[in-house]
């Protein structure tokens, strides 16, 4: 297997990307925080189906973690990540350090209003500012034609689509379907935090989402279905349940009735100390 080239500085990154663009090649970007799994690699493969060259970034972004979150504990293994990305077909790994992304005196943040409110936006203050700012910097550095993000972080996906739209960036943002284990658990780097007992319980989140979604589409009152879902999650061992809500799939506005167009059922809940998120289309 070929060794995947790694760029650490902006100048190294741009030297490679400028060369590709001089040849008329289309470039894709897959931003990640590392600790890669099959879900991340599916993003690379989707990007490869759209462009000629793919840059994958690995950067554990401190500005999107809250003071009591898991920045220090977040798993890091660059060598393993590089091997996986190379095997998936990526052409370049961009791996800046914190000083390279946020040099001394850095004082700019980007706020995307509207879709960043509610859900994780309310429960993780500053999170989407950190996401929007770092992704905007990655966009400016890589200048991709296409960027691919997973639908598991659905609110994040809509925040970044709004960012690109509002700032007139010539980038196509593509959402990739959630990749799941055979028992339904959405793949996540944080699944590594689960004990064996918790891992056995974790698929209950997806099962509950599916049941709630089916009940809503079957004519159940939305509030009653959501309340049942929260109670069911608690009975399964989850808690606290940060939210279980039905939203418009394009705007994330709360829906009180079954959606007439694409809707999204979103949930965030703790299993022990691990916060799991998931969502399904309704």
UniProtKB/Swiss-Prot annotation:
Signal sequence range: none
Q: What class of enzyme is it?
A: ligase
Binding of ATP, residues: 33-40, 150-153, 179, 187-190
Q: Any idea of its EC number?
A: 6.3.2.1
**Primary subcellular site in the record, as a coarse category:** cytoplasm
**Alphabetized InterPro entries for the sequence:** Cyt_trans-like, Pantoate_ligase, Pantoate_ligase_C, Rossmann-like_a/b/a_fold
GO terms for CC? cytosol
- Report residues binding (R)-pantoate: 64, 156
Protein keywords? ATP-binding, Cytoplasm, Ligase, Nucleotide-binding, Pantothenate biosynthesis
Q: Where in the cell is it found?
A: Cytoplasm
Catalytic reaction annotation: (R)-pantoate + beta-alanine + ATP = (R)-pantothenate + AMP + diphosphate + H(+)
| Pathway where this protein functions | Cofactor biosynthesis; (R)-pantothenate biosynthesis; (R)-pantothenate from (R)-pantoate and beta-alanine: step 1/1
Membrane-spanning intervals of the chain: none
| Entry similarity comment | Belongs to the pantothenate synthetase family.
Q: Which PANTHER family match?
A: CYTIDYLATE KINASE/PANTOATE-BETA-ALANINE LIGASE (PTHR21299), PANTOATE--BETA-ALANINE LIGASE (PTHR21299:SF1)
What's the stated role of this polypeptide? Catalyzes the condensation of pantoate with beta-alanine in an ATP-dependent reaction via a pantoyl-adenylate intermediate.
Q: What is this protein called?
A: Pantothenate synthetase
Organismal lineage: Bacteria, Pseudomonadati, Pseudomonadota, Alphaproteobacteria, Rhodospirillales
Gene name per UniProt? panC
